[in-house]
């Protein structure tokens, strides 16, 4: 074996070749930024020049006498991104060349590269900084020619996915929301539409791949209700659609290389995960791998209260909701209500799936006399592009309005004590719970915010600008929806929690909120977890966190 170095300019916090920078990894979901062609004689790679990206520094307290600092490049909204360029290294020529496509881009992203079956032709996705224009380029490395096969535009934004498969003739399968719902399409190699494969007022939630031998596509969708997920097969021409999973809940498939079988992981709100080997032709179970019956039996010994799924009409929309009531629920009594939500764009919390230990805390609270509820408001996913993208340029406006109104309506129920309604969330959910408590101070009496964004000005460029454009272009969208600017409205109990080692949502968010609360002469409680990241775990940390949350959430606690 022989090792050949093909790039020579790499330098920490300046130049990266072939792997992504922090923000690409976090928001575009990939790290390896190089790809071999099918003949193994060319490597395409992305080069990141992050010289001009501002540095973020984070104290690490550790166990030494002096703390240290972690310093890394982190482009916040509106700040300089890494400059990216596409290169192809030719093993025959022992030379790397920069790829120049036939269009000038200013401040852009290259979120995906993938070779076609033709060893000379590379596909590359180029996207503008606003992320509302996506070009799929076909680049012929031998002829130094390129053309755009697909140019998608959206009034809000376009999601980047891995849903691209090249067939033997280099026609390709692609997913898009262009008809209002996420669906599967088939294009010829020039980018001309052959047909739309899936259609309907429902979303394709996962594309598993293409079985070339049988001309079948396998995918997951919410055709059977937006809280459920099922696995389907469909012919390339859009005929012979077959539901392969038979049980309502969340089904997710992992297919064998030849698409003969798949391992199905199934769970529901009442059933812990079950793993089975299934036939891809029929969906029938071939073998049980793990049934979790022992766990299910053990859980049956506890007084577990089930989630009740329903919808609630709020601000003109039917919103998905679950509710958990005490086992000895008495409709003639009044119970305090504690609401959970996340609410981020395209997310879903009201789903028919097993949430394991994340739900055990709710069971403890229910046993202490709470009712727990969760409502997926506007901006959440799997109900079409319009429902999801209504929050564009106003993150936190419509989502908070929906949580406040839902709480009002639930508070009007005879068995809910409207004077004792609380809300909590983590990350985006903490941003939301803070805003809900401040803006809905006549509805919510307490809120918990864990690792919250408190101003989108503090968060990274790719995620934030996808939904908000830049602070320079949209200052009111950023500032009107920042809880920092509404601290004067605080009336109830407020708890802030953050890990000081959070490289994602920096503790700066909480520090700025704390300072604003102090200057507004508002009392509150807060907890910092030293050196813990966005997930706040390790050692006794997560147990400590939840025991603290239980203490804070005691129904007997005065509001």
What are these model-derived regions, one by one?
Residues 3-11, 97-100, 146-151, 194-199, ...:
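Beta-propeller fold detector
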Residues 6-34, 42-100, 283-297, 349-359:
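Predominantly five- to eight-bladed beta-propeller fold
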Residues 13-42, 70-85, 102-127, 133-138, ...:
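Conserved beta-propeller blade repeats
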Residues 31, 54-55, 119, 252-553, ...:
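Serine-hydrolase catalytic core recognition
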Residues 41, 46, 195-197, 208-295:
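N-terminal targeting or regulatory segments adjacent to alpha/beta-hydrolase or S9 domains
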Residues 53-58, 83-85, 131-137, 180-185, ...:
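Structural motif
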Residues 90-94, 140-144, 188-192, 235-239, ...:
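Short loop/turn segments that connect beta-strands within beta-propeller blades
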């Amino acid at each position: 074996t022989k090792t050949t170095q093909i790039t020579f300019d790499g330098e920490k916090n300046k130049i990266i070749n072939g792997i992504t920078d922090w923000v690409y990894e976090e928001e575009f979901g990939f790290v390896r930024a190089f790809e071999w062609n099918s003949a193994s004689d060319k490597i395409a790679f992305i080069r990141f020049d992050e010289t001009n990206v501002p540095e973020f520094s984070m104290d690490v307290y550790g166990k030494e006498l002096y703390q240290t600092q972690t310093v890394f490049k982190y482009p916040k909204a509106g700040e300089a991104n890494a400059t990216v360029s596409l290169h192809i290294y030719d093993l025959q020529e022992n030379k790397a060349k920069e790829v120049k496509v036939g269009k000038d881009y200013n401040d852009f992203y290259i979120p995906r590269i993938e070779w076609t079956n033709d060893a000379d032709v590379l596909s590359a996705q180029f996207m503008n900084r606003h992320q509302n224009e996506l070009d799929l380029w076909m680049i012929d490395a031998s002829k130094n020619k390129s053309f755009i096969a697909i140019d998608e535009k959206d009034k809000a934004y376009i999601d980047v996915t891995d849903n691209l498969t090249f067939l033997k003739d280099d026609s390709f399968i692609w997913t898009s929301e262009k008809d209002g719902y996420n669906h599967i399409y088939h294009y010829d190699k020039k980018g001309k539409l052959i047909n739309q494969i899936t259609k309907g007022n429902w979303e394709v939630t996962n594309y598993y791949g293409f079985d070339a031998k049988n001309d079948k596509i396998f995918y997951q969708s919410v055709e059977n209700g937006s809280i459920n997920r099922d696995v389907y097969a469909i012919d390339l021409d859009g005929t012979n659609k077959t539901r392969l999973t038979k049980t309502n809940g969340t089904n997710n498939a992992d297919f064998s290389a030849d698409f003969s079988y798949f391992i199905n992981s199934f769970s529901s709100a009442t059933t812990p995960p079950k793993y089975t080997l299934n036939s891809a032709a029929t969906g029938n179970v071939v073998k049980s791998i793990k049934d979790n019956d022992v766990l299910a039996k053990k859980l049956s010994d506890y007084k577990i209260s089930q989630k009740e799924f329903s919808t609630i009409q709020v601000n003109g929309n039917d919103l998905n909701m679950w509710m958990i009531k005490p086992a000895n629920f008495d409709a003639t009594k009044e119970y305090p209500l504690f609401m959970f939500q996340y609410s981020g764009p395209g997310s879903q919390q009201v789903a028919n799936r097993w949430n394991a230990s994340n739900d055990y805390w709710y069971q403890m609270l229910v046993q202490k006399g709470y009712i727990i509820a969760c409502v997926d408001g506007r901006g959440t996913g799997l109900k079409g592009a319009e429902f999801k993208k209504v929050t564009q340029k106003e993150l936190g406006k419509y989502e908070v309005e929906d949580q406040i109104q839902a709480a009002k309506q639930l508070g009007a129920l005879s068995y809910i004590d409207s004077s004792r309604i609380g809300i909590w969330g983590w990350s985006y959910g903490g941003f939301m719970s803070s805003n809900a408590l401040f803006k809905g101070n006549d509805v919510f009496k307490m809120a918990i915010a864990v690792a919250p964004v408190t101003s989108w000005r503090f968060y990274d460029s790719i995620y934030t600008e996808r939904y908000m454009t830049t602070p320079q272009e949209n200052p009111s969208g950023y500032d009107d929806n920042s809880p920092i600017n509404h601290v004067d409205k605080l009336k109830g109990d407020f708890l802030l929690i953050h890990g000081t080692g959070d490289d994602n949502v920096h503790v700066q968010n909480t520090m700025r909120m704390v300072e604003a609360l102090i200057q507004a002469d508002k009392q509150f409680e807060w907890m910092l977890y030293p050196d813990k990241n966005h997930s706040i775990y390790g050692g006794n940390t997560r147990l400590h966190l939840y025991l603290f949350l239980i203490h804070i959430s005691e129904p007997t606690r005065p509001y």
